[in-house]
């Protein structure tokens, strides 16, 4: 951190400290200047990735591609995190990941539309992303793979200030946004608006072999989503010890989809025995609402009590119009899908320092989730559409979770110990309204967690941790009614699914220096009753995909994260993960254990070849990974970002190219005695954006006594 400046009315003091990528700096003692200073403003460029004892923190503002990208694209640039072509998020090979917004659950991240929500959440509105591999008991126990906490942008500057962002992309993509902030005395108001227009081109090749025939399907899809996002918030320092914050956001998205499927079935002699062509014309309207209220009271030395409430809802109303030509016979049918999630969350948190070295955190959390899934089909009889009650259903999933937790953080010399326990009582009610049936489940679990760390000198830290977590089935996973994807593909849930339970342990070493940091972690994960997707043939070559519980699975490996400032003009972040995965699939009838070693690599490199100019490279490779019925093939992606700053007018120019080499795809192979299937999905290549951002307004930040990074650098 160079050019650190402290400004006063008649005195100017310049200080210099190090802020290399991934290095945590010590606090700066300013007591010698206290009688002269009214306000301290410390300016520095944030490091892109900081690896802490219990988490990785990724500063989105330092990712050049974030200026035009969505949250899902930025997540793919973070160590430990992977996002596939369908928007599914995983960590270290485990896709049971909990995603929080500002530390709280969100309906946008709770249901089947999570991938769509991430693709429409503008990365420019994100402050930072925290990746927590092995959370403590203070966090809700959901998410066996870990927690991703997305922290949205806010500002605390006095006066009126803001920023404007605009981007234009290839094949009709556009996005733009404005963020405003107004701070006056102890009040701060902020708001923003974001517009996104995207285009998704998809090609899917599906090749299946059964004992009696082969099926070849090719799907061409085009999606054109348009979204509008509004956000508004306020923070009020009522007194020096009391703070109230209120915030809300609304997102509306219209999504048009066109799809064409060509399918051919051949017998064992290679003769076409069946074929069809299917056209899909779909319109979807999505609405997402969210509001939060939080009150915090601070007392004593670092003690506080807070109470909060959150309401979050997401709904999708979709109309699908299908026309199918099969053996020279045309059929038409309409499918309407209503998919909605409603979340109420209330929390009480108490933090109290028992001594100078022992801090206790405890709390209560209540969460109520209502998930609705209504699927109605009507068939054309030549004159009108007639409801098809055999293929229509209404399903509601209700889930209440009551949680109590206590967590102690203790320091003994060079040792730090964190230990906690969380208890969660879960009540689930699955309502099959079409047949007036209700299925209830309830259970109680205890989730312990512990972490011990020790410093060796100023540069090395050792840590080890353990936690137990759970992954509860989503409502759609337990809906037993069948949804027809196409004439030869069906999907259905499993009402008998059990929650999966995960035990995770890790051991890590972290080394810090003025030039960078190196972190190495060994991890082990044991999963009981793991929830997995299974495909099986039923009658007449129709493939049914559902969810089932595995017996056990084991995952063990090592992860390395290296942050290094190589020269004044080159910063590098390297991440490598290798792990061994073993699955016991005997419960599913696929034989005994299946096992595989997988690895992945991630490179983020920042070049500054000229003053005010930055070039950023992002490259990721992932080898083949294990699934219960086969494997997912490896993939590679290379991205490029460019930025040029014009400091005199607070303007920055950007350009980015996603998938520069047109190599990104998703393919998997299933291989069982009854089913052999190869699927390959590709998206539109080389997404290109050019854009600009402008920061405006002045005003100073509210007084702080800690190092504060300036967002405008």
Question: Where are the language model's segments positioned?
Answer:
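Surface-exposed extracellular loop regions of Gram-negative outer-membrane beta-barrel proteins
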Residues: 146, 150-161, 203-205, 227-232, 315, 427-429, 458-505, 524-545, ...
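Short, acidic, small-residue-rich periplasmic hinge/interaction motif at the N-terminus
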Residues: 21-64, 84-86, 94-96, 132-134
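Outer membrane beta-barrel strand-and-loop segments of large Gram-negative receptors
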Residues: 218, 334, 343-347, 389-392, ...
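N-terminal periplasmic accessory domains that precede
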Residues: 39, 71-74, 114-117, 131, ...
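Transmembrane beta-barrel wall of Gram-negative outer-membrane proteins
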Residues: 172-198, 213-259, 287-289, 294-297, ...
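Short acidic/polar hinge/loop motifs at secondary-structure boundaries
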Residues: 71, 77, 105-133
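Conserved C-terminal beta-signal and adjacent last beta-strands/turns
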Residues: 594-713
């Amino acid at each position: 951190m160079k050019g650190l400046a402290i400004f006063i009315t008649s005195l100017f003091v310049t200080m210099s400290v190090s802020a290399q990528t991934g290095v945590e700096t010590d606090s700066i003692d300013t007591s010698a200047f206290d009688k002269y200073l009214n306000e301290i403003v410390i300016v520095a460029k944030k490091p892109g990735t900081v690896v802490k004892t219990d988490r990785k923190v990724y500063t989105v503002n330092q990712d050049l591609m974030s200026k035009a990208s969505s949250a899902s694209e930025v997540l793919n640039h973070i160590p430990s995190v992977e996002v596939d072509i369908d928007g599914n998020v995983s960590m270290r090979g485990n896709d049971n990941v909990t995603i929080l917004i500002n530390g709280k659950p969100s309906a946008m991240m709770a249901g089947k539309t999570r991938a769509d929500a991430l693709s429409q959440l503008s990365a420019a509105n994100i402050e930072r992303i925290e990746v927590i591999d092995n959370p403590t008991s203070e966090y809700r126990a959901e998410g066996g793979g870990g927690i991703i906490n997305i922290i949205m942008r806010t500002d605390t500057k006095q006066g009126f200030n803001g920023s404007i962002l605009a981007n234009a992309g290839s094949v009709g993509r556009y996005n733009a946004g404005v963020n405003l902030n107004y701070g006056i005395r102890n009040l701060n108001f902020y708001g923003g608006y974001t517009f996104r227009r995207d285009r998704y081109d998809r090609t899917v090749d599906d090749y299946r072999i059964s004992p009696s025939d082969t099926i070849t399907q090719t799907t061409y899809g085009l999606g054109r989503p348009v979204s509008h996002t509004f956000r508004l918030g306020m923070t009020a320092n009522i007194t020096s010890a009391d703070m109230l914050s209120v915030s809300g956001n609304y997102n509306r998205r219209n999504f048009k989809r066109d799809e064409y499927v060509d399918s051919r079935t051949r017998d064992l002699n290679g003769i076409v025995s069946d074929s069809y062509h299917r056209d899909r014309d779909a319109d979807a309207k999505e609405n997402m609402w969210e509001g939060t209220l939080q009150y915090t009271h601070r007392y004593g030395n670092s003690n506080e009590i807070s109470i909060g409430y959150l309401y979050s809802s997401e709904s999708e109303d979709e109309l699908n119009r299908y026309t199918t030509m099969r053996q020279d016979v045309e059929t038409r049918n309409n499918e309407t899908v209503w998919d909605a999630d409603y979340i109420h969350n209330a929390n009480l948190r108490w933090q109290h320092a028992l001594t100078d070295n022992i801090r206790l955190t405890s709390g209560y959390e209540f969460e109520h989730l209502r998930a609705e899934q209504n699927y109605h089909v009507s068939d054309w009889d030549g004159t009108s559409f007639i409801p098809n009650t055999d293929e229509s259903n209404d399903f509601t999933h209700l889930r209440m979770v009551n949680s109590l937790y206590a967590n102690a953080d203790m320091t003994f010399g060079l040792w730090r110990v964190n230990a906690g326990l969380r208890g969660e009582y879960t009540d689930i009610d699955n309502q099959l309204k079409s047949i007036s049936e209700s299925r209830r489940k309830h259970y109680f679990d205890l989730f312990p967690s512990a972490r011990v760390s020790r410093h060796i000198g100023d540069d090395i830290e050792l840590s080890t941790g353990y936690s137990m977590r759970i992954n509860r089935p989503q409502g759609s996973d337990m809906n037993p009614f069948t949804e027809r994807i196409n004439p030869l593909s069906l999907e259905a849930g499993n009402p008998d699914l059990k929650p999966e339970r995960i035990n995770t342990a890790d051991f890590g070493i972290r080394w810090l220096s003025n030039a960078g940091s190196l972190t190495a972690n060994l991890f082990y994960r044991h999963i009981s009753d793991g929830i997995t997707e299974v495909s099986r043939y039923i009658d007449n070559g129709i493939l049914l995909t559902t969810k089932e519980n595995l017996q056990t699975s084991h995952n063990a490996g090592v992860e390395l994260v290296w942050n290094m400032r190589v020269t004044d003009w080159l910063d590098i972040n390297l991440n490598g993960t290798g792990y061994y995965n073993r699955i016991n699939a005997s419960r599913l009838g696929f034989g005994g254990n299946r096992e595989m070693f997988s690895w992945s690599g991630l490179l983020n490199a920042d070049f500054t070849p000229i003053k005010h100019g930055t070039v950023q490279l992002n490259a990721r490779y992932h080898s083949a990974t294990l699934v219960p019925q086969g494997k997912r093939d490896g993939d590679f992606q290379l991205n490029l970002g460019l930025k040029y700053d014009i400091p005199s007018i607070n303007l920055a120019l950007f350009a980015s190219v996603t998938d520069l080499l047109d190599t990104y795809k998703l393919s998997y192979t299933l291989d069982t005695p009854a089913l052999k299937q190869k699927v390959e999905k590709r998206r539109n290549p080389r997404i290109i954006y050019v854009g600009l951002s402008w920061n405006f307004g002045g005003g100073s930040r509210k007084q702080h006594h800690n190092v504060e990074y300036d967002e405008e650098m």
